[in-house]
Amino acid sequence: MPSTAADVPAPNSILCEQCGYTLDGLPPDSRCPECGKPVIESLSGDGRSPAEWEAGRRRLPGFLRTTRQVIAIPGTFFRNTTTRGPIQSAKIFAALHWCIASILFATAGWIHWFAVMANDTIVGLLPALAWFGIFLLTFASLWGTTLLAAKLSAWEGRYRGMRLPPQVVLRGLYYHAAHYLPVSLLALFSTAIYASLSRRNPIAYLPYTTYYLYAISAEVILAAVYLFGTYWAAMRNMMYANR
């Protein structure tokens, strides 16, 4: 590892979107000296445009289509989405997904503890308060983790000579929030299925509780791998963007 930070390209420098080579001063009809990609494809022909949610369609159809694109084709989405400009719309998109994921995680946590582990022996107001507490804690954790990841990613980018300013990283992480949806749905599905089976015949399913806990632990590991992989897909396709 180098002992000093690498030089970060200037914000207005033109980078090759294929390899990151600085193209300043090269004519549009030439090619990148590093990888051979036509310079024009890193300029007006880069194919980047605002996400549907951001392009004046902040309604349910735009939200759903943008969510589908982020989840189904993350590399393509971040390769074709603009990285500059105001990030308020992206932040609202993230907040909606944090809220949805927090509801799903809170419900999964509630089912896991009160329906599976406690077997409905705890009644009264406590279960409702616990659900609301898990919801608030999850929402705050997702928000805080995003801000921390943005700071660390921008710092790492500067150290390694990547042009990843905080606003660009935040925009990417705000849209990356859509990936919490499949993770939270899987958590809810797993806990709900086991709770439903165990409630029908608690004695018969009691020996399988250990396997259920193993499965939940495996899901946590797989979710971490999935979230990091999609995070890197976002950063990799944004760090050479020119607009």
Where are the language model's segments positioned?
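A generic membrane alpha-helix/interface feature
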Residues: 38, 112, 183-185
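Short, surface-exposed, polar/charged, turn-prone segments marking secondary-structure boundaries
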Residues: 44-45, 105, 197-199
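Short hydrophobic/aromatic-rich motifs at helix boundaries and adjacent loops
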Residues: 3, 46-50, 124-128, 203-207
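Alpha-helix initiation/capping motif
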Residues: 22, 38, 46, 125-127, ...
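N-terminal juxtamembrane cytosolic/stromal segments of multi-pass membrane proteins
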Residues: 2-100
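Core alpha-helical transmembrane segments of integral membrane proteins
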Residues: 60-142, 154
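Hydrophobic alpha-helical transmembrane segments and adjacent short intramembrane/lumenal linkers
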Residues: 128-243
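Juxtamembrane helix-loop transition sites at the ends of transmembrane segments
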Residues: 46, 115, 186-189
